Amino acid sequence: MGKYNLILSEYLSFIYNSQSAVQIPIYYSSNSELENRCIEFHSKCLENSKNGLSLRKLFVEYNDVIENATLLSILSYSYDKYNAVERKLVKYAKGKPLEADLTVNELDYENNKMTSELFPTAEEYTDSLMDPAILTSLSSNLNAVMFWLEKHENDVAEKLKVYKRRLDLFTIVASTINKYGVPRHNAKYRYEYDVMKDKPYYLVTWANSSIEMLMSVFSHDDYLIAKELIVLSYSNRSTLAKLVSSPMSILVALVDINGTFITNEELELEFSNKYVRAIVPDQTFDELNQMLDNMRKAGLVDIPKMIQDWLVDRSIEKFPLMAKIYSWSFHVGFRKQKMLDAALDQLKTEYTENVDDEMYREYTMLIRDEVVKMLEEPVKHDDHLLRDSELAGLLSMSSASNGESRQLKFGRKTIFSTKKNMHVMDDMANERYTPGIIPPVNVDKPIPLGRRDVPGRRTRIIFILPYEYFIAQHAVVEKMLIYAKHTREYAEFYSQSNQLLSYGDVTRFLSNNTMVLYTDVSQWDSSQHNTQPFRKGIIMGLDILANMTNDAKVLQTLNLYKQTQINLMDSYVQIPDGNVIKKIQYGAVASGEKQTKAANSIANLALIKTVLSRISNKHSFATKIIRVDGDDNYAVLQFNTEVTKQMIQDVSNDVRETYARMNAKVKALVSTVGIEIAKRYIAGGKIFFRAGINLLNNEKRGQSTQWDQAAILYSNYIVNRLRGFETDREFILTKIMQMTSVAITGSLRLFPSERVLTTNSTFKVFDSEDFIIEYGTTVDEVYIQRAFMSLSSQKSGIADEIAASSTFKNYVTRLSEQLLFSKNNIVSRGIALTEKAKLNSYAPISLEKRRAQISALLTMLQKPVTFKSSKITINDILRDIKPFFTVSDAHLPIQYQKFMPTLPDNVQYIIQCIGSRTYQIEDDGSKSAISRLISKYSVYKPSIEELYKVISLHENEIQLYLISLGIPKIDADTYVGSKIYSRDKYRILESYVYNLLSINYGCYQLFDFNSPDLEKLIRIPFKGKIPAVTFILHLYAKLEVINYAIKNGSWISLFCNYPKSEMIKLWKKMWNITSLRSPYTNANFFQE
């Protein structure tokens, strides 16, 4: 068994090191004789420990268990009251504690003052500005670091250097914390006033960030960066990350391209050996030096020096150090401001009348025309989605907050809740549901606010609008997104593309006569000037569209949408400031509407077009591409002559001057070789991503459990690692141990083993080998998976009570009746289940389910239930396949250049051998004919699981299913009677399997699964025509080959001789695969 169990056992002896501590390992086996020995062994261990006897004899007597059974969990047992952290910490607190400089930050509360100075009384205190928002504590983090340090104090050679670097940094952290004492957390992992009052306010979040940074130190460079960030972030809680990452926007413009990848006509990446010189005017260097100066003024020394040194030869080879600095800067933690300051930030902008009206008009018209272009077709054809927009909105209503808490009655149960879905049900039950009236958000009913915190940027506010806004906008926005999906300009939405495609798009046209203009418009989006022209453009577009139809329902939809825009032009927000709630007129665009992303992209595109049309008066160029991606836009301009410093200087100044005429405070840059936007940056013809996901601090608290957060932590670690920021894996595993342990009583704790946490069951948290998703096929693995599946999903009394109430039932019935033309149990049950699942975001319900889950888990970890679940998982399928494959050694040459320098070596190697993919594999069934047929006539969107169920029904049942959703009988008949139907069966099965195998997550999303180089390693003689079977055999083989290569850095080839008789059996099995949701799949999904 793996490294995890070994570390677990060492960790337990490190934590519970007193005489009274006992560790009892619990084993299980699928072999019934051995299983009985496991049970005996366990009960004797308990017996002995109760009587204070040693367990050593038992370990000898039951050697067969230890050798042959599988470790299930470790029960640990200690009467020691847990003040061990303080004791251990003293050993490391040998340095000088940090002293915060209390004048660094502009806002008083952002200075790291004593808590009692910022909040004189407990009533005034709030932890919202420093809450780590993660279900693990500072003391656990300290323990994890000290465990690592103790374990490695005897390392030698290079490893000793790493130890010394980390020890040195930890001394700073330990000394500072030791000066004030370790803050103790409460049961909810929050830090209360009496704990914090005599300590610096930001101590906890700073210490978490510092630990995260020091455990990511390997090289000397890492050490210098980390040391500087740890020391300075103790005082500077506001601008440090921004200062350190600012230079990147210029650095990308300084590296020559010598060979790069470009997108070809087939949308694949293709190597191009072009050479493009970086042309940099002096003004750019002045700006860069100014940035470096600002860094030095803030007390940074080593980081600006590294950048300065790199500037000497500006080589792409040494650029990864710049990328590293850029990534590290985010790990100083989130900047959390008071809501008032976050809102006032946008309102501080000086409003001038001195703007170019002509440009504003052009901007508004472009928005208008784009809105019309997006919605023209659906409006002219009276699209059913626009007719049934209200139903569509209700079906996809979220369970987020509706902005106010209300008392709701469900049957005999009365609850208080803020959730949108519950408010809708309650309003319907009480005749208050009026989707045709969009409530005002003016001074009488100001908008409550949410917040979005990001490292290195100011806190942004989010509107929490009444659900009527969502219903009014949903259908129209969906139509806009469908348009954006096949429009290349919208990089974020473009059909199944990924970031690599966008990378090839930029490099495609770069040459000695082109320049690329890139702008960060996040400031513009939330500026006051944007609001009138922005909303007016949309309104004008809607007015034009209204003249294109006579359908009353479509007109109503457009009208309600228009009303949301009108209302939002006069918006007020409510901000709690101490005990008072301030109402402020807010004239800017904030997130929170359904249209936020789509509308921002439209406005962005309009903005860059407006600017380009202005500067084309002065310069003659052809616009090769325009792209908008979130808050950023970029364009490649081609000139008739070679680009010179002077030209760049002129274009750059003209662009800035043009933006200034609209009073748009944006960062606009021009370069010949690279760009930097929020999502990715291109330098020297290579693509980089910012590895800036915080591990030990979270943005906000949600209702995820400790297990969920452990999986999210692991998932974040993986994403960072792929992007070039590596945290020590042993440390991550130690955090997983801490976060997945279950307390039974004060002195009893249960720690699950690696097998439990890595088998793909409903409890999976991480992979035993980074980047490789294993599907266990050994008897013990399948046995434990079956056992976990027998733990049916947990019920909740509150949820059942709500679901039984007439309020809930009537709501679900109402949805079904509006949607269905005849009885359809699959859909009705689906709606009821979805609605019931939405209740999970109501805390009491999720708590109830969590408790039930934990008690079931506790039983399970002490003795697995023998239960033969009849469900088939993907593991069963792979287990059937495995025996028929024979392995032999193979060789694949490296044939592609590197284009993503931050990748770990083993992943890089695979891309260099088989190539990368620029598209997402379709894994939701949306491309199938049946899915398209349904969306042609109905607003209902079946999930991949539902399609998978439906497509395997009898033909007449499929017909009934379709007819009930309003598909005309003739179309349903044609579908079932045609070849398309059998093609669909295969296609949906394919999507479903891809979905189960997480093919679009982790590092698998980077590999070209259809690579001819990969195909030639796999030989499967063609027997009988069952494409589904051929597909699964090939896919299994590809995963095996790739996983082997990730692990060993070499290739194997597979030969499969699959008997014809088995094929039909396998094919039947493939229609009964159960999908498993786990914290692990959740975390993947959570990544995007």
Curated annotation (Swiss-Prot):
Residues annotated as domain RdRp catalytic: 501-687
Catalytic activity: RNA(n) + a ribonucleoside 5'-triphosphate = RNA(n+1) + diphosphate
Gene Ontology biological-process annotations: DNA-templated transcription; viral genome replication
GO cellular component: virion component
Cellular localisation: Virion
Keyword entries, A-Z: Magnesium, Nucleotide-binding, Nucleotidyltransferase, RNA-binding, RNA-directed RNA polymerase, Transferase, Viral RNA replication, Virion
A Pfam family of this chain: Rotavirus_VP1
Quaternary assembly: Interacts with VP3 (Potential). Interacts with VP2; this interaction activates VP1. Interacts with NSP5; this interaction is probably necessary for the formation of functional virus factories. Interacts with NSP2; this interaction is weak.
Enzyme category, top tier: transferase
Alphabetized GO MF terms: nucleotide binding; RNA binding; RNA-directed RNA polymerase activity
UniProt record similarity statement: Belongs to the reoviridae RNA-directed RNA polymerase family.
Protein name: RNA-directed RNA polymerase
Domain of life assignment: Viruses
EC number: 2.7.7.48
Protein task: RNA-directed RNA polymerase that is involved in both transcription and genome replication. Together with VP3 capping enzyme, forms an enzyme complex positioned near the channels situated at each of the five-fold vertices of the core. Following infection, the outermost layer of the virus is lost, leaving a double-layered particle (DLP) made up of the core and VP6 shell. VP1 then catalyzes the transcription of fully conservative plus-strand genomic RNAs that are extruded through the DLP's channels into the cytoplasm where they function as mRNAs for translation of viral proteins.
Cofactor: Mg(2+)
